[in-house]
């Protein structure tokens, strides 16, 4: 009788472990690779890379002549907010290595394929959008909304000839709202300046996490970034786009202190650090 009971219990446990509800994690992982480069791994294991300038000087994986692109084994989608070199970054090499599809505006995607060699078959109307547009990717697990940004978007051509322009049209700069099933809603501002309609982004999408540029000079100064965070009202605020170059803000501490006064939680990450969002909490 005892043996029969053990067999029944073992069978029940095996069934539970095999069921999606038991085995599937609801954890979303966010890695900051320095500057504006983020990696997101969804609960189902899809990998999104945002503005993947992995070789930036803040990334510890780029130290001592090590190539951080070598460390990336999987990328399903590359999301690019605008055409500047520090956001296009290493996307072409990453795409050729992993087969990642490109999510960006149509003009930038087209020129990246023609002038930089991004594989043309790794983009299309399923991934190229414009401000106000929405796409669903990752087998329905991820929804991406392209939001406005006040910034420029020239695409730099490294091998331009003497009679050719060094910078070509890269569409309109943008931000992204990324909704992940069984995970967070993440708003990445891109390099935008503050604009009052950020309140509408917060009101409409209710982001759990905001990735906000604070570096100044080429984007929002920290005090303006605080206004942006207050407008969006995300529960967690992660600063980025700082301390990469001397002209940028070096210390995020004053920004983090101001965010606390607005009853939000600042999450100041170190380059290379990964945080996990699970059960409504970022840790």
Question: How would you describe each model-predicted region?
Answer:
Residues 50-51, 75-83, 103-106, 186-192, ...:
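Active-site neighborhood of phospho(di)ester-bond hydrolases with catalytic His/Asp-centered motifs
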Residues 49-55, 131-135, 141-153, 193-194, ...:
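Conserved catalytic scaffold of divalent metal-dependent phosphoesterases
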Residues 157-231:
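Active-site-proximal loop/helix segments of hydrolase catalytic cores
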Residues 56-57, 85-89, 109-112, 133-135, ...:
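Active-site environment of divalent metal-dependent phosphoester hydrolases
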Residues 43-85, 89-96, 116-120, 153-168, ...:
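Pre-active-site segment of Zn-dependent metallo-hydrolases
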Residues 2-47, 54-56, 63, 147-151, ...:
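Zn-dependent metallo-beta-lactamase
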Residues 24-28, 42-48, 134-144, 179-186, ...:
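Beta-strand-turn-beta hairpins that frame and shape the catalytic cleft
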Residues 102, 116-138, 226, 230-283:
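Binuclear metal-ion centers of metallo-dependent hydrolases, dominated by the metallo-beta-lactamase
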């Amino acid at each position: 009788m005892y043996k029969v009971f053990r067999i029944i219990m073992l069978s029940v446990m095996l069934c539970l472990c095999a069921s999606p509800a038991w085995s599937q994690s609801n954890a979303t992982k966010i890695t900051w690779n320095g500057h504006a480069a983020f990696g997101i791994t969804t609960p189902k294991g899809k990998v999104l890379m945002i503005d993947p300038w992995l070789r930036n000087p803040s990334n510890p994986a780029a130290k001592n002549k090590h190539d951080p692109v070598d460390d990336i084994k999987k990328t399903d989608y590359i999301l690019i907010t605008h055409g500047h070199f520090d956001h296009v970054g290493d996307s072409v090499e990453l795409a050729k290595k992993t087969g990642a599809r490109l999510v960006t505006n149509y003009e930038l995607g087209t020129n990246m394929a023609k002038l930089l060699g991004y594989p043309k078959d790794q983009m299309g109307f399923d991934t190229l959008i414009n401000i106000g547009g929405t796409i669903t990717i990752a087998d329905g697990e991820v929804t991406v909304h392209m939001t406005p940004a006040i910034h420029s978007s020239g695409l730099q051509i490294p091998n331009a000839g003497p009679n050719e322009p060094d910078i070509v049209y890269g569409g309109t700069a943008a931000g992204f709202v990324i909704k992940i099933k069984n995970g967070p809603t993440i708003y990445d501002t891109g390099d935008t300046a503050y604009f009052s309609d950020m309140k509408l982004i917060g009101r409409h999408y209710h982001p759990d996490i905001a990735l906000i540029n604070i570096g100044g000079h080429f984007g929002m100064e920290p005090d303006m970034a605080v206004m942006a965070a207050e407008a969006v009202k995300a529960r967690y605020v992660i600063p980025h786009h700082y301390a990469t170059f001397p002209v940028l803000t070096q210390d995020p501490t004053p920004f983090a202190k101001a965010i606390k006064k607005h009853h939000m939680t600042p999450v100041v990450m170190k380059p290379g650090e990964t945080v996990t969002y699970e059960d409504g909490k970022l840790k």
